[in-house]
Amino acid sequence: MRNFIIHILTGLSGSGKSTALDVFEDAGFYCVDNMPVALLPKFLEIPVNTASGISGLAFVMDLREPDFLATYPSVFNDLKAQGYRLTVLFFEAGENVLIQRYSQTRRHHPLAGDKGLVSGIRRERELLEELRASSDTVIDTSTLTIHELKIRLLARIRKSADHMPMRIHVMSFGYKYGIPHDADIIMDVRFLPNPYFVDPLKHKNGTDADVAAHVLNHSTGSAFLEKFLNLIDFLLPLYKNEPKAYLTVAVGCTGGCHRSVAVATAVFNHMKKREERHVEISHRDLKEAGQTT
């Protein structure tokens, strides 16, 4: 696993490590919460196919593990000496913020014991001071919203990773079968010429060249497609910076067989030419209409 970037997420309890781990998971990282430090070297020996789609590895490690403080220095140093790309992110927040978060969630602080929450927070900060000083990055989440934390983490991931893909799903659908609820962009193409009313094309679908030509190779179709693709080109960088891990572009016509399939296929091919590596296409309602690709 030396080819993968390894992010160690550590720091104060209640500072946002679990939220951060969710961001890494959405970014295509393989994630483990409360990973024992001593098991990390063995875990990294597991062979993983580099074509598996995994962007990297992220582990939450903290004082929930009794041996964490005694074990992490030697393990981290040994892994770096062996050539692993390991980076440590330390999360923290102000005392009053942590108290408020624990009051809201009503969760138990791991070091609170009989002395109470404030004592536990202060003791944890003291114990982790050396780790904080040696970390690659310290992130104070006191004033950050969840959205702002995501933006900061994704910016870091994009900077350090070989790629931080936004996964794009292009789909066609028929309005008669309902609008897809997970779509981010919906384009209604029922204004385009309908091949259903052309006998030689009626029983074909939009993946057939003659059907696609009927839909797109005329003034209205070609002008629309050019403008729609320009809109997609404009929006993709904005969605990537949002941040957004998944984007679904849905194209709809009446039955989901001809016009929507032709346009969705054109959008998909355009994205592939843009070298969008993580893009897929599906035609939701071809089977509903008795069509196959």
UniProtKB/Swiss-Prot annotation:
Organism: Desulfosudis oleivorans (strain DSM 6200 / JCM 39069 / Hxd3) (Desulfococcus oleovorans)
Superkingdom of the source species: Bacteria
HAMAP family: RapZ_like
Family: Belongs to the RapZ-like family.
Binding site for ATP: 11-18
Known role: Displays ATPase and GTPase activities.
Chain positions recorded as GTP binding sites: 62-65
Keyword terms, alphabetized: ATP-binding, GTP-binding, Nucleotide-binding
InterPro entries: P-loop_NTPase (IPR027417), RapZ-like (IPR005337), RapZ-like_N (IPR053930), RapZ_C (IPR053931)
One function term, GO molecular function aspect: ATP binding
Name this polypeptide is given: Nucleotide-binding protein Dole_0503
